Amino acid sequence: MAKKVEAYIKLQVAAGKANPSPPVGPALGQKGVNIMEFCKAFNAQTQGMEPGSPVPVVISVYSDRSFTFTMKTPPASFLLKKAAGLKSGSARPNTQKVGKVTRAQLEEIATIKMADLTAGDMDAAVRTIAGSARAMGLETEGV
């Protein structure tokens, strides 16, 4: 018989930097999950990623307190800020533009995010990422 899923926990943890302190410890501790086991497994899987990049993770906690987790790609906003060389987006995105991204950069980000997007093809994915860029106050060239 398959194990019964008790809960899903959604977290965003920096790659290679999972530790028992908040937000990881309290979220997993409430469900009775072995915190250090998760931290070691997560850090091992994110070893090849850029250290410190935020990685969304969905943890499935089973009735016997075991767990599995799936990692998603970093948020589009993080990738866009990195591509544009910014620390943060615009406070007033419709009036105050803070940077530019090219179509080539948008295609690169869309390629990374394709697994998590519901877009049917690459062009739709690029338009989705371009919309995120405009919402952050970035100008999009060639879209």
From Swiss-Prot:
Q: Report the superkingdom from the record.
A: Bacteria
Pfam families, A to Z: Ribosomal_L11, Ribosomal_L11_N
How does it get modified post-translation? One or more lysine residues are methylated.
PANTHER family from the xrefs? Answer: 60S RIBOSOMAL PROTEIN L12 (PTHR11661), LARGE RIBOSOMAL SUBUNIT PROTEIN UL11M (PTHR11661:SF1)
Listed under subunit, the entry gives: Part of the ribosomal stalk of the 50S ribosomal subunit. Interacts with L10 and the large rRNA to form the base of the stalk. L10 forms an elongated spine to which L12 dimers bind in a sequential fashion forming a multimeric L10(L12)X complex.
Function in brief: Forms part of the ribosomal stalk which helps the ribosome interact with GTP-bound translation factors.
The name of this protein is Large ribosomal subunit protein uL11
Q: Which gene encodes it?
A: rplK
